[in-house]
Amino acid sequence: MISTMMTSKSKIGMMTKKPEHSGLLVIDKPQGVTSHDVVAAVRGALHMKRVGHAGTLDPMATGVLVVGFGNATRLLNYIVDHNKTYEATIRLGQRTTTDDAEGELLPAGERAVNFPSRQAVEQLITERFTGRIEQVPNVYSAIKVNGQRAYDLAREGKDVELKARPVTIEEFNVRQARYGYTHSDRAGTELAGAVVAERAGDGWIADTAPHEDMQPVMDVTVTCSAGTYIRALARDLGEELGLGGHLTMLRRTRVGRFSVNMPNVMSAHAESKTFTNREGMEVTRNRA
């Protein structure tokens, strides 16, 4: 936590106001809660109203959420514009309405009879998904259309058309490829993936699935500019491979200089709405 104490003088005399607590918290957001939920919990823990965050994470995502309180909220507009790094898992051969595992499955694409080689996938990423690219966000996003959130319009059944936006992909590396089971069988996915990856030896997989219910899965690392949608990358990569694709896991490991590996990262506990440091001590502020 980066914390400061600030005082100010009144216009009448030299009376000093009560010091205002302010600072930044680097929080490891858990899965299943919104960024707004985390902010609300920080307000309760610190007994403060002036709290905000630098860059929304979807409920499915985990990782770095920079939260500012007091005068430090002024810094959030600068922090949100910094580059970000993500670790993600992309499932190929399945499309969803939201481009991630939270959405409903769409009609299946072609079966991945022959999975491309590592060289072919990496060449495609270099040519089409590295540097400055144009990206169309999913309609289930927080982008505003005529003053309304796109996801609100989409949930109301209204037609939403979002324009392509320029983003910059600095790094898009495939760590490994493996086979996993269906969209809903996540436990089976990890087990099967580990077995097949071990057989491959080099972190890649055979060109055919060992079981008809399995689909290819890729673990990737992406460093990108602000405003990049990783689930849109997953969708577009799947389309370029002719298979379709969606995001099944997303973890933000860095926002600017704030990393999930920093010693002062806080763990957020959704049920109790509390925060602890790496030693397990609860973080709060006395009202006095």
Predicted regions and their residues:
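Catalytic/RNA-binding core of pseudouridine synthases
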Residues: 2-288
